[in-house]
Amino acid sequence: MTDAQIENKFKLAVDYITNNSGKLSNIKNEEQLYLYCNYKQATIGDCNTKAPPFYDYIGKSKWNSWNSLKGVEKIVAMNSYISLVNALSPGWDSNIKVERATQSVFLNDEEFKELEKKEKEEKEELKKLEEENGGEIEKPKSKWMGPVLSKFSLVDDETLEKLEKNTKQDLGYWVSVNDIERVKKEIENDKNIINEVDEDGRTALIWACDRGYFEIAKLLIENGSNVNVQDGEGMTPLHYAVVCDQFEICKLLLSQSSIDKSIKDNSDSIPSDFIDSSTSENIKSLFK
């Protein structure tokens, strides 16, 4: 098949999976991830989002699968997607004529932003309806194997909403919005706040490590932030830095004489236990 025919068949395969998710309920998790990551690679290209935090297990799995395809050409990802659909449902395309694609399924930046905007508006509308009906509203069933295009966030939506409504605007807030000048001012006003924790046990340093803000992390450490502090899940700043693949921050933390790499979280895991195939080689080298 020509590239144009592959592109068209890919689009049909995506439609087939989306419209027949009920019939394909026995698909294994790894097969779902395979479809997901190849869809993302085929329509967007290389992973362009930051790794989700450790506590977003589903998001992290999806991110890892997509990121593992870095460098794979879009047309190759399309073929991979089609091949698995063929294996899962032989003959699905027996009555379909593969013709030249009339509309590209590739997404440019403008289209991607427009889809994100639309998804956000739909989410806000659904939330509004829920509030008006006291939460008694039927939510649409998810068909995640289809074209799910929302970007991942390092912090879950609920936490972000809390931050937006945070009238206190404490040190953790200013770190989360990457305002280093305000962080400096807050520390100058009261150094005692540097190790204060939020309701989930996160300090300002943990926030900086989660979001990859190196300069802020460095500033916090220089001003006495505890590099071995544990949040509500027992995770240390180093746990966060490894999970979120933040090489410079990992290096910064490991350069501290007081760092303890052997601290276990509540699941009995030390930071290096989170190193997997998706972890950058630079980070892997730090723990050899």
Swiss-Prot record:
<feature type="binding site">
    <location>
        <position position="81"/>
    </location>
    <ligand>
        <name>an acyl-CoA</name>
    </ligand>
</feature>
<keyword id="KW-0040">ANK repeat</keyword>
<dbReference type="Pfam" id="PF12796">
    <property type="entry name" value="Ank_2"/>
</dbReference>
<protein>
    <recommendedName>
        <fullName>Acyl-CoA-binding domain-containing protein 6 homolog</fullName>
    </recommendedName>
</protein>
<dbReference type="InterPro" id="IPR036770">
    <property type="entry name" value="Ankyrin_rpt-contain_sf"/>
</dbReference>
<feature type="domain" description="ACB">
    <location>
        <begin position="6"/>
        <end position="94"/>
    </location>
</feature>
<dbReference type="GO" id="GO:0000062">
    <property type="term" value="F:fatty-acyl-CoA binding"/>
</dbReference>
<dbReference type="InterPro" id="IPR000582">
    <property type="entry name" value="Acyl-CoA-binding_protein"/>
</dbReference>
<dbReference type="InterPro" id="IPR035984">
    <property type="entry name" value="Acyl-CoA-binding_sf"/>
</dbReference>
<comment type="function">
    <text>Binds long-chain acyl-coenzyme A molecules with a strong preference for unsaturated C18:1-CoA. Does not bind fatty acids. Plays a role in protein N-myristoylation.</text>
</comment>
<feature type="binding site">
    <location>
        <position position="62"/>
    </location>
    <ligand>
        <name>an acyl-CoA</name>
    </ligand>
</feature>
<dbReference type="InterPro" id="IPR002110">
    <property type="entry name" value="Ankyrin_rpt"/>
</dbReference>
<feature type="repeat" description="ANK 1">
    <location>
        <begin position="200"/>
        <end position="229"/>
    </location>
</feature>
<feature type="repeat" description="ANK 2">
    <location>
        <begin position="233"/>
        <end position="263"/>
    </location>
</feature>
<keyword id="KW-0963">Cytoplasm</keyword>
<dbReference type="InterPro" id="IPR014352">
    <property type="entry name" value="FERM/acyl-CoA-bd_prot_sf"/>
</dbReference>
<feature type="binding site">
    <location>
        <begin position="36"/>
        <end position="40"/>
    </location>
    <ligand>
        <name>an acyl-CoA</name>
    </ligand>
</feature>
<keyword id="KW-0677">Repeat</keyword>
<keyword id="KW-0446">Lipid-binding</keyword>
<dbReference type="Pfam" id="PF00887">
    <property type="entry name" value="ACBP"/>
</dbReference>
<dbReference type="GO" id="GO:0005737">
    <property type="term" value="C:cytoplasm"/>
</dbReference>
